Regions:
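N-terminal interaction modules that seed assembly of large macromolecular complexes
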Residues: 1-38
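HEAT/HEAT-like alpha-solenoid repeats
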Residues: 8-19, 45-55, 96-106, 130-143
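Eukaryotic acidic, Ser/Thr-rich intrinsically disordered low-complexity regions
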Residues: 133-166
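Structural helix-adjacent loops and short alpha-helical linkers that scaffold large soluble proteins
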Residues: 39-40, 127-130
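A charged, amphipathic interaction segment
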Residues: 99-120
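Helix-adjacent hinge/juxtasegments
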Residues: 38-91
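Residue-level detector of extended alpha-helical repeat arrays and alpha-solenoid scaffolds
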Residues: 22, 56, 60-63, 111, ...
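Hydrophobic residues within the alpha-helices of tandem HEAT/HEAT-like
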Residues: 28-34, 63-76, 113-123, 155-164
């Protein structure tokens, strides 16, 4: 992002859900975070305070992907900046949002990102994996082929890692 001084404004537009451009701002935010996730770190309190209020699926998908970016940087890459910035409260809100997105009617991409985020969060928060498995198994037969593929993949990983029982 050539002008990081506008990041605050971009985030502000993402969470002005009454505006018809909020979802477009969320798309741009996703692209910016793919390139410079560290720009979001000073704003995580605000991000996680407002993310539960976003309901439009066009905005939820990019926000769920940003949650996945944060979770991967925290749990897989162990990025020191993300490890310092992402608090337990942030992770709790992230888990709540991801579970909400799994049990409400969302697009498959959002559901897939949510499953992956919860899989990663479950390595630290022990109650997540059993709940995630239950939700996936309850929904797998009536959801799309993309949901089924991601659900089988996540359950397979949890079983392989001996995080859940068959």
């Amino acid at each position: 992002m050539d002008h990081p001084e506008y990041f605050h404004d971009l985030l502000d537009f993402c969470f002005k859900t009454e505006l018809n451009i909020a979802h477009k701002a969320a798309w741009i935010l996703e692209i910016v975070c793919e390139e410079q996730l560290e720009l979001l770190l000073p704003h995580l309190d605000w991000f996680f305070e407002d993310i539960p209020n976003v309901k439009k699926d066009q905005a939820v998908r990019p926000l769920s992907k940003i949650c996945l970016m944060l979770a991967k940087k925290f749990y897989k890459k162990k990025d020191p900046k993300v490890v310092m910035a992402l608090s337990n409260k942030h992770k709790e809100i992230m888990a709540e949002c991801c579970f909400d997105w799994l049990i409400t009617d969302q697009k498959v991409a959002c559901e897939a990102y949510s499953m992956h985020v919860l899989y990663l969060l479950g390595s630290e928060i022990d109650w997540i994996h059993p709940e995630l498995k239950t939700i996936i198994e309850q929904n797998i037969h009536q959801k799309s082929s993309g949901y089924r593929a991601q659900g089988r993949k996540i359950i397979g990983r949890m079983m392989k890692d001996k995080l859940i029982e068959k």
